[in-house]
A protein has these predicted regions:
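Alpha-helical transmembrane segments and their immediate juxtamembrane cytosolic regions
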Residues: 1-333
């Protein structure tokens, strides 16, 4: 039964369809980017970072995480967050999805695929998102910004006194050590939920916008581009004119997975989830999967840029984005 204030007109149905196609297309871009990073080498034969990694490393995974937040927002009311029993039902559904993701992720972790399985991390991320499902963008955007700025600092402080991660995938047997499992999922692992909370909050905030409107898509495109460029530029200034690179070269990377790599290559490939703890200057990098404030803000910006571009393309060239949307609609999250 439709109330007079929510009549489904042809225009609103078309707007909703465009929105969903654009979101699915952006998810397709993320999936292709993640597959490209897994398939192609990080370093080219000449010793430089490969083009695939320069473009997609870190950015595609961040896009996927932001879109997970967008999906949760759309499932819980879109621009109008649900209230009362409807909100409670959305929260319960999200917890159920989190459980499924966690169980499937633990089972997949038993296979020696050579890939970092993200599903268990996503399960915990969805649990983290539950208390925020009733909020609107005016609160969610500042919360996402605070998470991006503060959680890397908290992570850097915590990890100075924590054991190094296993760099293995969580498996069912990991449940026998719940404290160790939680610390790796939340702080030290490949996709640490502490810092990745910025992505899910940013996605929730974006999903609360009127994504079917052209001005929203344009705002995401332009705002994302500005955020990505600005954070990259500030990081460059800190690392170069301000002397950050020299400090990092002197401090070294300790037992981090990037140890032994030339610094310029390490900064453009992958940090495997966290920064080294040998210097606080590591928080100034914008390196893929470093979880620094600049990495989080830069990749949130690129995610918004891609989503805005796909939403606009869905308006003017719907057939062109259908292949990407078809790919994106098949993802598990």
């Amino acid at each position: 039964m439709t109330t007079p204030g929510h009549v489904a007109t042809p225009d609103t149905r078309l707007s909703s369809a465009r929105r969903l196609i654009g979101v699915d297309a952006a998810r397709g871009v993320a999936l292709i980017g993640m597959m490209s990073v897994h398939i192609n080498p990080a370093v080219a034969p000449d010793g430089d970072t490969s083009t695939t990694y320069l473009i997609a490393s870190g950015r595609s995974a961040a896009l996927f995480a932001v879109l997970a937040g967008v999906g949760l927002a759309l499932a819980s009311g879109g621009p109008t967050p649900r209230r009362g029993r409807a909100l409670a039902a959305a929260m319960a559904a999200t917890l159920a999805r989190a459980t499924v993701l966690g169980v499937v992720g633990l089972l997949l972790g038993a296979f020696d695929s050579g890939l970092a399985i993200i599903l268990v991390y996503y399960g915990l991320l969805f649990v983290v998102a539950v208390p925020f499902l009733g909020l609107g963008p005016r609160l969610l955007f500042p919360l996402a910004a605070m998470a991006a700025a503060l959680t890397p600092v908290i992570s850097q402080w915590l990890r100075q006194s924590m054991p190094p991660p296993s760099y293995g995938n969580p498996v069912v047997e990991s449940l026998a050590d719940p404290v160790g499992l939680f610390s790796e999922l939340a702080v030290t692992g490949y996709y640490p939920v502490l810092t990745w909370s910025a992505y899910i909050l940013a996605g929730l905030a974006v999903g609360r916008l009127a994504l079917g409107e052209a001005k929203t898509a344009t705002g995401l495109l332009l705002g994302g581009a500005v955020l990505a460029a600005a954070t990259w530029a500030v990081s460059w200034l800190l690392l170069n004119p301000a002397g950050g690179l020299e400090t990092l070269a002197a401090a070294g990377s300790g037992s981090s997975p990037i140890a032994g790599r030339p610094l310029d290559v390490a900064l453009t490939t992958s940090f495997y989830g966290t920064t080294p703890t040998t210097s606080w200057w590591w928080l100034a990098v914008v390196a893929p999967h470093s979880g620094s404030p600049f990495d989080l803000l830069h990749t949130i910006g690129t995610a918004c840029f891609v989503l805005g571009a796909m939403l606009l393309l869905a308006r003017v060239a719907r057939a062109a984005v259908w292949p990407l949307a078809a790919i994106g609609s098949m993802t598990f999250t």
